[in-house]
């Protein structure tokens, strides 16, 4: 029963879409009507500016952290953290109050991975960041990150690995059109290194 309760707690907190709250409260708009129509960090940052993208990301990380800590202290057994993570992703990607139309779960999955196993989480996140810089793409690296993390955790605990693999599949589903765009050459390129250099005032040769 603990696994079910952990999943439900995660789902309830996952339903709090920071992008929608920020959009309605501060910008007086519906984020799903702009850009990629995705109520997530990337779309908020791309359409309304980095400040709102960062605020959205922080909000999503905070809701995830609260849910994970509740499960951590209430239900013994590390495996329950994985189920809370599954609930968070389900709630974030398929919120019941928004007709099951939510975000893609990148920030949430990163938070869950680091909370569950911070060493493996940070290591796979680093790989994803390097891939992002090399590929100049925001679609494939998050999926590679979650896949690598899932495989590693499967070696440690098969049940946890399967739960994280389900999370990976949910993300693949949410990213499906972006994946198609990437492999057909229509994916949006994001030069992270250029953005960092520009922010620091470093001129490219």
Swiss-Prot record:
Catalytic activity: an acyl phosphate + sn-glycerol 3-phosphate = a 1-acyl-sn-glycero-3-phosphate + phosphate
Name used for this protein in its record: Glycerol-3-phosphate acyltransferase 1
InterPro entries cross-referenced by the UniProt entry: G3P_acylTferase_PlsY
TM spans (from-to): 7-27, 52-74, 78-100, 125-145, 160-180
Role this protein plays: Catalyzes the transfer of an acyl group from acyl-phosphate (acyl-PO(4)) to glycerol-3-phosphate (G3P) to form lysophosphatidic acid (LPA). This enzyme utilizes acyl-phosphate as fatty acyl donor, but not acyl-CoA or acyl-ACP.
Broad class of enzyme this protein falls into: transferase
One Pfam short name: G3P_acyltransf
Gene coding for it: plsY1
Any one GO BP annotation for this protein: phospholipid biosynthetic process
